[in-house]
Amino acid sequence: MPQKSGRPVVTQLGKFEQYLIEEFFDDYRAGGMSRHTFTRRVAFITGSMAAAAAAMTLVGCSPNEVPRATDPMPTPSPATSSPGTGTASAGAVPGAKSPLSVPEGAAGLLTATVKFPSGGTDISGYLARPEGVKPGPAVLVCHENRGLTPHIQDVARRFAKEGYAALALDLLSREGGTASLDRDAVPGALTQAGAQRHVADFKAAYDYLNAQDYVDAGRIAMTGYCFGGGITWQAATELTGLKATSAFYGPAPDLDKVPTIKPAVFGVYAELDDRITGPMPELRAALDATDVRHELKVYPGVDHAFHNDTGERYNEAQATAAWNDTLAWFRKYV
């Protein structure tokens, strides 16, 4: 993995733990996250202050920036009114800047919170689909490390406006749902659950959608953003029924699993996102050595998370281009 701004490469964490801690370190160094928040999030990911101190040192923090191993673990704060698995409030999405944004209650769409079984429990998801009963294609949507947010619900509605039944899972359903958790504890809860559990939940979601009369059986795609992009890549190696995937700047799958990919895979990368785009040629080479239908595209002049129009890195031109490219990919293969 390439270095960014002189930061050492982390080598002693799991893939998704490493991915998130490095992302938060970059936000902290750029002034977009306080040291207090950075420390809390790393502690929730690693499970102890000693491990948090070690991880923060590995990513490049100085000794006076890391907590003492004997410091108490942060206490999760009571959840605020952050929306999660509940039905979204009608109207515009808070902070949305994209002209593609679709408000809750938009004409011609049906939205609801649905539940389906996975691993002996019920998983919640936000479903958005066109009105009517004519069967059409569907797409599974995997959220970022923030959990199921109004932005991701908006993305689901954008797909619904394009004719898809879009199901955005709350991968923290077993923990009570995104809305029930301290926002700093959400990334740690996601990594502690493990990518395999998340992929299994998407398999259950696939089966749920495939059984609905408004879905044209078998015509199901998947997309994900940041952390969700990594889950989408892993799902592509395991969920053989998927027709296509579009992973937005997520960590790559294990290269030895690339030959098992069945769907047509599209990768969205940001030119300035060294951490994810830097290793991308290795993934491209692995894909080139197979019969997997694929395209990995780098969007110029933008950084990680450029598609999220509620964030500071949003770029309207490139986000719109990546969205249109994803739709074109799905039209071709789904």
Task: List the predicted regions and their residue ranges.
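N-terminal secretory signal peptides
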Residues: M1-T37, T46, M56, G60
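Serine-hydrolase catalytic machinery in alpha/beta-hydrolase-like enzymes
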Residues: K4, D27, S34-T37, R41, ...
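Primarily recognizes the serine-hydrolase "nucleophile elbow" in alpha/beta-hydrolase
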Residues: K203-K262
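Short, proline-enriched alpha-helix->beta-strand connector loops that line the catalytic pocket
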Residues: T260-V265, T290-R293
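Short beta-strand/loop motif that positions the catalytic acidic residue
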Residues: G267-Y269
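Acidic catalytic loop of the alpha/beta-hydrolase fold
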Residues: L272-T277
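Conserved loop-alpha-helix segment in the C-terminal half of the alpha/beta-hydrolase fold
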Residues: M280-D291
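C-terminal catalytic histidine-bearing segment of alpha/beta-hydrolase fold enzymes
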Residues: R293-V334
